[in-house]
């Protein structure tokens, strides 16, 4: 009898999860992805400082090599952004 109750609760939880998560799955964080097919590079300038160039604003340059490899080519990825309608939301996160 207990097994039947546990099974019913589990099935209900899965169905509820499916109903509430389908809207999230259809949302795209890409929008108009300005970072698609953009490449970036890492080099050292004349002063010996690391220079990363090639990605537009709002994009992150990701390299598939170690941090000490120069020069290196990477790929640009768009950073995810979030917004809130609650004025106190930022203050709560900073605490």
UniProtKB/Swiss-Prot annotation:
Organism encoding this protein: Rhipicephalus appendiculatus (Brown ear tick)
Family per record: Belongs to the RaCI family.
Protein's UniProt name: Complement inhibitor RaCI5
Keywords: Complement system impairing toxin, Disulfide bond, Secreted, Signal, Toxin
Localization per Swiss-Prot or TrEMBL: Secreted
Residues spanning the signal sequence: 1-21
GO terms of molecular function: toxin activity
GO cellular component, one term: extracellular region
Disulfide-linked positions: 35-59, 40-61, 55-76
Job description of the protein: Complement inhibitor. Prevents complement-mediated C5 activation by binding to C5. Binds C5 at a different binding site than the other tick complement inhibitors OmCI and CirpT1, and the drug eculizumab.
Tissue specificity: Expressed in salivary glands.
